[in-house]
Amino acid sequence: MQFSRTALRLLFPVLLTLCAILPLGSLQAAGYRTANFIIEAPTEQLARRIGDAAEQYRHDLAIEWVGQPLPRWSRPCPITAQVAPTLGAGGATSFVFDRGEVFNWTMTIQGSEERVLDSVLPHEITHTIFASHFRQPLPRWADEGACTTVEHPVERARQHRMLIEFLRTGRGIAFPEMFAMREYPADVLPLYSQGYSLARYLIERGGRRRYVAFVGDGLASDNWAVALGQHYGINDLGRLQTVWLDWVKHGCPAPPAAIAAALPSPQAWSPTARGQSPDPTASQHPPRPQRLATTAGRQSIYAMQAQRTQRQLPDTSTADSGIIRR
């Protein structure tokens, strides 16, 4: 079919308008499916890389955290990825808890290809592992803090620098308040940094499975001081706050081997990590959606131009006054 020059001149503005109003991602999006994920990304190659990495993280991190791989979900989790070199890294994972089951997974991730693959994706996958294992919302510090420990060292170092700044400026969160948080506070960035630091402190002293057992016992009893004493030999949240602050002030040193050896012997830990409910529509009760609204906080964190030089740690008086927020 041949077009006259007049027809081409008439069509050209229409094509320009379509290109302007359609999102670039919709023109380039490609898909890839694995056993547990359906990925939409700018290119087929990138979708494949994200999908394969998601499955690998799901397998390996579940073993590290709960002792065995997760069963296959009855329905795959859609992952929508926006990837560009200058795009701030971030992610959000949504799912529904209902009568002890979890389903309706949805995940969005964004950032540079490097940060998506080495930080955002493992962070969000860890959220799904915890949701599958605990089947209920966790305190925000315990969830976000643990998920941040699997990110790239560059991102973890950034969180530490931000923590020091928050402690200096009085934006720290008292531990009794932080342990009670089931929702994100208005000032969310200190929660991420402080939660990561405390999770790191505990994991370095007992490993990831002890951390999971501690969180599980705290959820079951709603007595975090008792759970803390059972797993870490510290029987008070105020005491934990004090020893953690001292650790931060001394540069977060790795614990000697004797520390782990002296921890209380754990009770039998169940590695059970159930999968997704095979038929969520069978429930007779309306599901309660639980969204892990990580996007706002993480985008703000990673979009910041963090200084690459390590700041000095706070002195005792600054840190002590900064952490307590009444």
Predicted segments with their positions:
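Acidic/His/Gly-enriched intrinsically disordered linker/tail segments
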Residues: 94-104, 115-116, 133-281
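Non-catalytic terminal regions of proteins
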Residues: 264-326
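Active-site-flanking segments in enzyme catalytic domains
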Residues: 128, 145, 165-168, 300, ...
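N-terminal secretory signal peptides that target proteins for export/translocation
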Residues: 1-8
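A generic structural signal for well-ordered alpha-helical segments enriched in polar/charged residues
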Residues: 22, 59-63, 246
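Juxtacatalytic substrate-recognition/specificity segment
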Residues: 28-139, 181, 224-227
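Bacterial N-terminal signal peptides
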Residues: 10-23
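Hydrophobic helix-coil surface modules that form long, contiguous segments used
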Residues: 28-41, 239, 253, 267-273, ...
